[in-house]
């Protein structure tokens, strides 16, 4: 019975990974997002699964992930921010998830996610980037 449940779960996960998403990253970002997958069902908001890697030699206390949804004309339709995993050691990778509670996402929409701020352990200063401008450039260049 456990074998059947495992197969059914694996099939369900593969069937639900149907919304493509791109990474938008500032050149000097201390955190890199990889392995992004958006899972959705008809009766629940989509969920983003991602791997976050600290690309620095310093321990990070916290970071923020931002997801952008653009319509087919390149207009920003929605934006959602969420805290990432707490404490990423130097060069460490951790997986996390984010519920995308941004309303309806059409199959023709473009989704992008990235890290727009991070803070080192023991520091009051934040690294920040304007990912919206970068994401808008990508969407505009893809439209041409």
Model-derived features with residue positions:
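Bacterial N-terminal signal peptides
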Residues: 7-15
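Hydrophobic beta-strand positions in extracellular immunoglobulin-like domains
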Residues: 52-54, 69, 100
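Terminal connector regions
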Residues: 101-144
